[in-house]
Amino acid sequence: MSSTAENGDAVPGKQNEEKTYKKTASSAIKGAIQLGIGYTVGNLTSKPERDVLMQDFYVVESVFLPSEGSNLTPAHHYPDFRFKTYAPLAFRYFRELFGIKPDDYLYSICSEPLIELSNPGASGSLFFLTSDDEFIIKTVQHKEAEFLQKLLPGYYMNLNQNPRTLLPKFYGLYCMQSGGINIRIVVMNNVLPRAMRMHLTYDLKGSTYKRRASRKEREKPNPTFKDLDFLQDMHEGLYFDTETYNALMKTLQRDCRVLESFKIMDYSLLLGIHILDHSLKDKEEEPLQNAPDAKRPGMQKVLYSTAMESIQGPGKSADGIIAENPDTMGGIPAKSHKGEKLLLFMGIIDILQSYRLMKKLEHSWKALVYDGDTVSVHRPSFYADRFLKFMNSRVFKKIQALKASPSKKRCNSIAALKATSQEILSSISQEWKDEKQDLLTEGQSFSSLDEEALGSRHRPDLVPSTPSLFEAASLATTISSSSLYVGEHYPHDRTTLYSNSKGLPSSSTFTLEEGTIYLTAEPNALETQDDASVLDVYL
């Protein structure tokens, strides 16, 4: 058997190729995982709950499961194997922290066959998904499992301080031993829900050296692209409202500093993009083939498992996409440079890589041939800074609020002035109609009023309907905070136009010039309308 098959690739020469890992068929690995976890979690429920102690992080429990069964284990049709559980009490605490009950954990992993996923990475690991879409089970190398064991105390402390994180959430570490072969697996949170179709998937490191999806990967139905592909497809980045952007970058910065403190590097941001504008078309054309069965609820049950929960985001985009809506599956609302509405699903993956001697040597020889800053393998501090810079400047961007130009502001002010002027005219007209009624009730005749108001011009057929200039000016001050002036050419000495302290100019005019309102009077306008005052606004 070829070495590629041993690393997890398909065995050639078979119609329905079954993957193998370390010369063990994936079906045998899946069966052993379900049997082993079913036994160890069930056995753990009998132990009383207590606080996690330091020695609990280094406990390893082991059970032998023969194919014929035993007093403690059921019979099965797989080869005999031994199943080890690392730090069972510590991982039980982690599961409880995220609201995972033992029964739910067992039901998710053991009730239905595990779904095997393709692996776009170079590690050769196998990936399995639970039928309810909650958990990912991944095979890991010996060094990765060993590193996770050493990481557990610090990981425990970090989760206590901040359970909302984009870092992987580990729920269990196990080892299957059969025929002298050790297969180590880790149970983690699922970042990309199957119920939501991912139109684009990216694995981003912030590096450019060989960071383009291979031709083989591109031929897959759902390929995973890389950094250079993202820069080509989304050259202007992804846009968020201010609150969501700040929450996302704050979470990324905190998580990167945690990884840096553990001397972890070579991690990636797994980014799934669902285009809302395409979702209706997809539903009309074809049903979602890989959707979970009806037993699965619309949202994930595990606490802090969605992307929006992980960044502590507000759950609302600039144009009102609500992340709490079950249809969004907890995705983060965003927009593309084309204006497309998006839902983003993301998480930091592949954190079980410490900056050891082999990584230092790998970077050293690559830096001799290529630009050292573009190589993905780097010292942890530089890697974190480059990762954050790439996310902040090339991937995620903030929607800038549009500022109105001065001309638009002036137009808006003029429109408001016109509207307010109409209100003033209406109020003035109504006020004088009321006053006319009061005058009529007091017995004042139309002729005497005309005589007082118009002096020598006797117009008994007209009723004064225009307010005094000064009264109109006092009302006009509510239009704008601009200065209000009375035109100097106004004939103040013509007192014959006023009567009973409520003189009536024949007409009055507002003139607007650069934020200043001028009032002018035209006393020679003789023809006055009966039902409204002659008050014009010139702009």
Swiss-Prot record:
Its EC number is 2.7.1.68. The modification Phosphoserine is found at S445, S447, S448. GO terms for biological process: phosphatidylinositol biosynthetic process; phosphatidylinositol metabolic process; phosphatidylinositol phosphate biosynthetic process. Residues 1-21 are annotated as: Disordered. It is an enzyme of class 2 (transferase). Residues 25-395 form the PIPK domain. Catalyzes the phosphorylation of phosphatidylinositol 4-phosphate (PtdIns(4)P/PI4P) to form phosphatidylinositol 4,5-bisphosphate (PtdIns(4,5)P2/PIP2), a lipid second messenger that regulates several cellular processes such as signal transduction, vesicle trafficking, actin cytoskeleton dynamics, cell adhesion, and cell motility. PtdIns(4,5)P2 can directly act as a second messenger or can be utilized as a precursor to generate other second messengers: inositol 1,4,5-trisphosphate (IP3), diacylglycerol (DAG) or phosphatidylinositol-3,4,5-trisphosphate (PtdIns(3,4,5)P3/PIP3). This is Phosphatidylinositol 4-phosphate 5-kinase type-1 beta.
